[in-house]
């Protein structure tokens, strides 16, 4: 297949592109700085800054574009950047798809379990209604834009992704804290943490590219979510480091502001559709996932 990945220079995009390249697919990666990314990346692919630079028909599109939610405070200006980098960019992508003589067969669009907001103890399958906080509203608007691809006759899947454990994202800074003897939970760590190993995220996306019966939202989270304190205690055990710092949640608010919601929202997601599909999990539990990732590094 000829597969277009937008946001192809990020942690997830690069991991997916590497796997798809090894499987023999033809790749086009969209980035704001294609020349720089082409020099950095070892993946054989065409890099483009403009969608109109793509000259060959595309069979599948994986949309992973979007500014980082955590790096900067959520000022009104930053919220606009976060919104536009997802909704407006996805709208432009759909406009490009609509103008193709041969539209893609499948469209996988980024999303997040933040769709559900803070669900407490409730199990969130793909049928669960969306939350009301700002991150949830952002994800819901992103999905609402993406599903319009169905009007083009394109099978559309929404990748409701949990925190991905791998060489990027949440895990590396956590490991540094633990290795420095500063590891700990957040408050009591009682909130649910719906994680996924990068290998399973890539494997699930590959399965969704070819499984023609699946459409709509799909939870990309491991089948065994844990409370956050179990995640940190397991990480400490794997790294042979103590887990003793547990700053109260109220202490995070002055530093992180609204971004605290990203860290402490309780989301107990269940990958109902992936399980029904018969997806074989490489790392279904947090102990095996962290052991693998810490051993690799």
Which residues does each PLM region occupy?
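NAD(P)H-binding glycine-rich loop region in Rossmannoid oxidoreductase-like domains
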Residues: 36, 41-92
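Conserved Rossmann-fold NAD(P)-dependent oxidoreductase catalytic core, especially the SDR/UDP-sugar
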Residues: 91-133
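Glycine/proline-rich active-site loop of Rossmann-fold NAD(P)-dependent oxidoreductases
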Residues: 140, 152-154, 165-174, 208-218
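Alpha-helical substrate-binding/gating segment
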Residues: 175-183, 191-225
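Conserved beta-loop-beta element that borders a ligand/cofactor-binding pocket
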Residues: 111, 144-167
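N-terminal Rossmann NAD(P)H-binding glycine-rich loop of SDR-like oxidoreductase domains
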Residues: 3-23
């Amino acid at each position: 297949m000829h597969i277009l990945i937008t946001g192809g220079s990020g942690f997830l995009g690069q991991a997916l592109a590497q796997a798809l390249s090894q499987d023999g697919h033809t790749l086009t990666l969209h980035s704001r700085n294609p020349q720089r990314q082409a020099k950095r990346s070892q993946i054989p692919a065409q890099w483009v800054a403009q969608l109109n630079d793509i000259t060959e028909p595309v069979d599948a599109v994986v949309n992973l574009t979007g500014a980082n939610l955590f790096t900067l405070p959520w000022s009104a200006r930053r919220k606009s950047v976060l919104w536009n980098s997802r909704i407006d960019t996805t709208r432009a992508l759909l406009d490009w798809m609509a103008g193709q003589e041969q539209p893609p067969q499948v469209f996988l669009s980024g999303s997040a379990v933040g769709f559900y907001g803070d669900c407490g103890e409730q199990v969130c399958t793909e049928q669960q209604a969306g939350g009301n906080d700002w991150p949830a509203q952002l994800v819901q608007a992103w999905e609402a834009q993406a599903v319009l691809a169905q009007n083009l006759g394109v099978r559309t899947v929404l990748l409701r992704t949990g925190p991905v454990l791998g060489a990027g994202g949440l895990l590396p800074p956590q490991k540094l804290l633990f290795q420095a003897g500063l590891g700990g939970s957040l408050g009591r760590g009682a909130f649910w943490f719906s994680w996924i190993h990068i290998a399973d995220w890539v494997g699930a996306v590959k399965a969704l590219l070819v499984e023609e019966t699946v459409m709509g939202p799909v939870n990309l989270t491991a089948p065994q979510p844990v409370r956050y304190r179990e995640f940190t205690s397991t990480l400490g055990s794997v790294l042979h480091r103590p887990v003793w710092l547990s700053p109260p949640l109220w202490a995070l608010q002055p530093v992180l502001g609204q971004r605290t919601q990203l860290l402490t929202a309780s989301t107990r997601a269940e990958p109902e559709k992936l399980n029904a599909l018969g997806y074989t999990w490489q790392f279904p539990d947090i102990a095996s996932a962290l052991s693998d990732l810490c051993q690799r590094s």
